[in-house]
Amino acid sequence: MARKKASIDFEQSLADLQALVERLENGELSLEDSLAAFEQGIALTRDCQGALAQAEQKVQILLERDGELAAQPFDAEPEA
């Protein structure tokens, strides 16, 4: 259950960050609101980066073989 919650937290943080960027790009926020949104965006970015770093560590652990790390590049497109 903790894994699913972490995934949901990452996905929600990313969605919140995207919404903040859209609001900032609209240019309709006051200076004060823009600064608050920017500050919140920085916090969300740090949360997302932390979650990604944790996921990368877990992948490296899973790829570990015979006490050595077998680093393999991630291929986003499956071979046909």
From Swiss-Prot:
Recorded superkingdom: Bacteria
Keyword terms: Cytoplasm, Exonuclease, Hydrolase, Nuclease
InterPro entries linked to this entry: Exonuc_VII_S, Exonuc_VII_ssu_sf
Alphabetized GO MF terms: exodeoxyribonuclease VII activity
EC nos: 3.1.11.6
SUPFAM superfamilies per record: XseB-like (SSF116842)
Key word Nuclease present: yes
Protein's cellular compartments: Cytoplasm
Any GO BP: DNA catabolic process
UniProt catalytic activity: Exonucleolytic cleavage in either 5'- to 3'- or 3'- to 5'-direction to yield nucleoside 5'-phosphates
This protein's record includes keyword Cytoplasm: yes
A GO cellular-component term linked to this record: cytosol
Pfam families found in the cross-reference section: Exonuc_VII_S
Function as written in the Swiss-Prot or TrEMBL entry: Bidirectionally degrades single-stranded DNA into large acid-insoluble oligonucleotides, which are then degraded further into small acid-soluble oligonucleotides.
Oligomer and partners: Heterooligomer composed of large and small subunits.
Family: Belongs to the XseB family.
Alphabetical list of PANTHER family matching this protein: EXODEOXYRIBONUCLEASE 7 SMALL SUBUNIT
Protein name: Exodeoxyribonuclease 7 small subunit
Chain's gene name: xseB
